């Protein structure tokens, strides 16, 4: 594993990063050196490389923010793909806003760090850099950051320092919160392609028959019922990547609440519309306000980061349940 990781680091440093500089030069025009007033660390979600799902991006972002705090470096966030983040989230205690027109793209006056190979040992991320640096990263390395710098940062606390819902998003949160009430648990499932939704890359195959799909859906609904029995008189927020499952659980005799809208994976979809973005943000903010959060898993399903990290935002108890 370490040997493979070292190879990926080498590819990042010797191939991906120079290629990104060449691509930027073609897009922006040639500039050898540009001076600036500050030299921030900028986390990039710009669609120029794959970024992963919502919480892959947030995991990487929080890691780089923690490092910037530890090193005393300004931190900014350039999130424009597949939507502009500032439509839905705004700075809370720390101003991370920056426009790409304000960024430094002089060939010799900025660095980019594409850090696919840093998951095991993120040593390249720890370096204090004197020039503006654009980071591409998708992992939670906060424990390693704390160990390296002697800090005690908490993921949810850092998230809350950075973000709060915009007035636009808050209107939807207030509406759906009023519908579900205050007394609820949250249950999340991630089937990916198993039920035939085809909203994901080919990480896992679609089940081969309708009977297999029906059996998996029935088993998942029974798992929801078992959890419900542990929480009498409590509503259940259901969040899932499968519209097939959502339509089936609506038919079950359970007090479930489902945020209206369609689910898409923000990296594989290529683009999302406003209603899909609202559903994603509302799902994870409502999850963060639940009494407890559960993630259901069965062989072939994906152990999603979405519910676990949403729970961290609200400092809510989280449990994986295998069925």
Question: What residues fall within each predicted segment?
Answer:
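Secretory-pathway glycan-assembly enzymes, especially type II membrane glycosyltransferases
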Residues: 13-209, 214
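A short glycine/serine-rich beta->alpha loop
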Residues: 47-52, 272-273, 292, 296-297
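A donor-sugar binding/catalytic signature common to diverse glycosyltransferases
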Residues: 62, 278-323
């Amino acid at each position: 594993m370490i040997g493979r990781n070292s190879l990926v680091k080498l590819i990042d440093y010797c191939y991906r990063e120079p290629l990104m500089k060449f691509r930027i030069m073609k897009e922006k025009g040639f500039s050898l050196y540009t001076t600036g007033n500050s030299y921030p660390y900028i986390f990039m979600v710009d669609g120029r490389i794959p970024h992963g799902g919502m919480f892959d991006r947030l995991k990487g972002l929080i890691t780089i923010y923690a490092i910037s705090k530890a090193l005393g470096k300004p931190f900014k966030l350039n999130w424009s793909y597949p939507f502009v983040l500032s439509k839905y989230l705004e700075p809370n205690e720390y101003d991370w806003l920056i426009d790409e027109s304000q960024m430094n793209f002089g060939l010799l006056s900025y660095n980019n760090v594409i850090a696919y190979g840093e998951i095991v040992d993120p040593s390249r991320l720890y370096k204090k850099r004197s020039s503006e640096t654009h980071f591409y990263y998708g992992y939670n390395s906060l424990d390693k950051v704390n160990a390296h710098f002697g800090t005690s940062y908490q993921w949810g606390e850092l998230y809350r320092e950075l973000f709060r819902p915009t007035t636009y998003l808050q209107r939807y949160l207030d509406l759906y919160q009023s519908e579900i009430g205050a007394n609820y648990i949250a249950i999340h499932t991630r089937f990916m392609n198993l039920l035939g939704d085809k909203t994901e890359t080919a990480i896992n195959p679609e089940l081969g028959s309708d009977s297999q799909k029906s059996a998996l859906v029935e088993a998942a609904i029974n798992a929801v019922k078992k959890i419900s029995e542990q929480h009498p008189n409590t509503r259940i927020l259901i969040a899932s990547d499968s519209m097939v499952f959502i339509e089936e659980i609506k038919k079950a005799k359970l007090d479930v609440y489902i945020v209206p809208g369609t689910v898409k994976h923000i990296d594989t979809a290529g683009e999302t519309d406003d209603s899909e973005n609202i559903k994603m943000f509302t799902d994870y903010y409502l999850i963060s306000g639940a009494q407890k959060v559960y993630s259901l898993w069965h062989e072939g399903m994906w152990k999603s980061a979405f519910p676990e990290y949403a729970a961290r935002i609200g400092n809510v108890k989280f449990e994986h349940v295998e069925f």
